[in-house]
Each structure stands twice: as C-alpha cells, then as structure tokens.
C-alpha cells in the first residue's frame, strides 16, 4: 500500500505506483498466503486498475482469513455498491467504523458512501459522528459536497473556506472569494478550478479534482476534458466515477458515457444502470 500512498499525495504516477505495489503484494502473498493484509492490498490495486471481479475475490479472501480486516471491509463495501447492494454496502461500512473507530482513514468511507448514494442527511450525521469521535479529523470537504448537492450554497462555501483555511491554502481561498463576488457560487467554483489548473502547471494536482470542480461550476466541456486527463492519469477516484453526485452536470453527455466505458469495461452498462437508480 505504500506505493499507492505515494501516488495519492503526488509523489509518483498512480499507474506506475500500482504496478510496483502489485509486484510487492504478490511476493508477500507468496511468502505467506495466510496474511489477510496482502490480499486486502492486492484487492485495492485490482480495484484501482479496473479489475473489479478479481478485486472483490481478493477482499473476500482477506475477510475469510480475518473477518475484521478493515481495508477488506471497505473494499467489500465498494464491491457491494458496484453490484447495486447499497444497504449491504452501508452495513459493511458501519462495521468498519465499529472495528476501527478512531482511525481517520476507516471513518471516512461511511459518510462518503452515504453521499454517493444520495442519502445526504445521513451523510451529514455520519460526518458529525466522526468529528465527535476523531476531533482532529475534520471532513469539511465532505460537508461542502453534501450542502452543494442540497442547494445550500452558503453552507457549502463556508465548509470550503474552513477546509482551505485548515490547510493554509490562501490561493484557493482568494479564488473562492473573488469568484463568488464576480459570479456567485458557480463563479466561486469556476475560479477555484482555474486556480487549480494554474497550480497544475507548477506542482502536482490530481486532474480528477480539477474536473470535479469544473463540474460543480456547471462547465461541462472543461470538466470532461480534465476527467479524460484523470482517466489517462489513473486517478483513484475514478472507481466511483458513476456515483459522484457532483458530476451530475456531465452525466448525460456522450463523452461521460465513454469515460464510464473506459473505467468499467464490460460492466459499464450495468454500473450505469445501478448508479442511475441511486
């Protein structure tokens, strides 16, 4: 998982890191196939590279070896969501939070999945529960997504401000305020997206983040351009491409359908149907 983590924070290319991770994990499994973490890690590599059936089999094997394996619980929840079993997916994530209640990485999936399947009020409650349990881990960005989807733009932008202030990101904060003054909430998103593009010329920015921000601004062409770049790049968030509510503005565009085909392969039509019913 260390190789994947390097890519998550911009120190390496996702595709290269995942292949290095795959080699290391296969060696670990060969050395001791009874260790569940090896199968969990391999499952995540397979999921992020679009090998959905193989990933879900790896997660099941990890859980057979250790029914409380946290990374495998998260992975199986993703598999259940991709198969259309939303309630079962959420149940798995509640198990995950119970197994690892104080580790931030295992408390993030529940509110995010609730957001992805449109259970927005529950997502807010889940975030609040995490804030009480893990006070140092503030999910302002998740609340910003949820409030935006609810049309509560003032609250969404306030959560964006809190997130940016927490990270000391004065550039994006200034872009938000300037864009808001010039063009309202959608202007704020546009200005933030443009600031991310400018930043990408100097340092690492996940192209998925740029595309998602343009989508929230309602700028379909720009959003799809950067989502296409994210597909070439191998951005990890693409595994949820069919489900992110903030991508709704691009959902009916044929170019988005093409991206889904590239991400999900032969399961694209099935997953499109499932995500449309959320």
Question: What do the predicted segments below correspond to?
Answer:
Residues 5-9, 14-16, 23-26, 35-42, ...:
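Alpha-helical protein-protein interaction modules
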Residues 30, 34, 64:
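Short alpha-helical segment in the cytosolic histidine-kinase catalytic core
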């Amino acid at each position: 998982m260390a190789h994947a983590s390097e890519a998550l924070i911009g120190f390496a290319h996702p595709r290269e890191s995942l292949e290095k991770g795959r080699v290391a994990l296969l060696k670990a499994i060969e050395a001791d196939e009874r260790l569940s973490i090896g199968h969990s890690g391999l499952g995540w590599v397979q999921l992020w590279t679009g090998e959905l059936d193989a990933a879900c089999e790896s997660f099941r094997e990890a859980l057979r070896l250790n029914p409380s394996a946290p990374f495998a619980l998260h992975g199986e929840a993703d598999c259940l969501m991709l198969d259309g079993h939303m309630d079962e997916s959420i149940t798995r994530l509640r198990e995950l939070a119970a197994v690892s209640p104080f580790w931030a990485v295992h408390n993030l999936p529940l509110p995010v999945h609730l957001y992805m399947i449109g259970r927005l009020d529950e997502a807010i409650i889940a975030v609040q529960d995490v804030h009480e349990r893990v006070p140092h881990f503030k999910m302002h960005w998740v609340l910003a997504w949820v409030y935006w989807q609810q049309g509560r733009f003032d609250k969404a932008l306030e959560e964006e401000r809190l997130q940016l202030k927490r990270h000391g990101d004065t550039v994006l904060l200034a872009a938000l305020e300037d864009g808001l003054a010039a063009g309202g909430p959608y202007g704020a998103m546009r200005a933030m997206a443009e600031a991310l593009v400018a930043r990408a010329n100097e340092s690492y920015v996940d192209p998925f983040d740029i595309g998602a921000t343009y989508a929230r601004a309602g700028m379909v062409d720009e959003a799809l351009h950067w989502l296409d770049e994210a597909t070439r790049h191998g951005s990890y968030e693409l595994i949820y491409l069919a489900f992110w509510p903030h991508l709704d503005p691009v959902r009916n565009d044929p170019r988005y359908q093409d991206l889904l085909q590239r991400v999900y392969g032969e399961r694209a039509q099935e997953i499109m149907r499932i995500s449309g019913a959320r």
